[in-house]
Swiss-Prot record:
Gene3D superfamilies: Electron Transport, Fmn-binding Protein, Chain A. One of its GO terms (molecular function) is FMN binding. Keywords: Flavoprotein, FMN, Oxidoreductase, Pyridoxine biosynthesis. Binds 1 FMN per subunit. It comes from Flavobacterium johnsoniae (strain ATCC 17061 / DSM 2064 / JCM 8514 / BCRC 14874 / CCUG 350202 / NBRC 14942 / NCIMB 11054 / UW101). It is an enzyme of class 1 (oxidoreductase). It catalyses: pyridoxamine 5'-phosphate + O2 + H2O = pyridoxal 5'-phosphate + H2O2 + NH4(+); pyridoxine 5'-phosphate + O2 = pyridoxal 5'-phosphate + H2O2. Homodimer. This is Pyridoxine/pyridoxamine 5'-phosphate oxidase. The gene is pdxH.
Amino acid sequence: MNDLSNYRKSYEKSELLETNIPEDPINLFNRWFHEVEDFGGSGEVNAMTVSTIGLDGFPKSRVVLLKKFSEEGFIFYTNYNSEKGKAIEANPNVCLSFFWQEAERQVIIKGIAQKTSEIISDNYFDSRPDGSKLGAIVSHQSEVIPSRTFLEENLKKLEAEFEGKPIPRPENWGGYLVTPLQVEFWQGRPNRLHDRIRYTSQSDFSWTIERLSS
């Protein structure tokens, strides 16, 4: 067994105080997102973990890329027939989490996922490189396949079929908008006394703000 008990570090880069936060979590997320960009580092700042409850009753998490956020919520794109797509269809309650190690920050978002409009999905699909478009068509995500060669051969066929032609978005591929119900911001602090601020959505579209113990 590998003993990792000595793996630890002190978090000392910043703080999260009630006197310096907005009333709306999206505004704070926007601030943090761009501050993390300024920190630099090798990771993708828009990489997030999407957690769903599968048809087997077990939670499952995977990393996907956030493609847009606004007051309405958070948008990502995927194959609707994938394991995550089927899970969301059965149970739209999802959790998004961001861990920005270079800034010693984490954001956890609980919300409801629903498909974006076809126009939004079409517009994003049209912005993708042709190789990514064809990849979305050729890959029946989460299905068992005989080999990687199977995918590569099917991709070559599609490349020949669509050479010089527009590539349409497949109906089973598109976006999800996650409407946030609760957003927690975590800032690492010394001695494990981390700052945790939680926003919870109210029926009048306002947010309650609470500090949580670390």
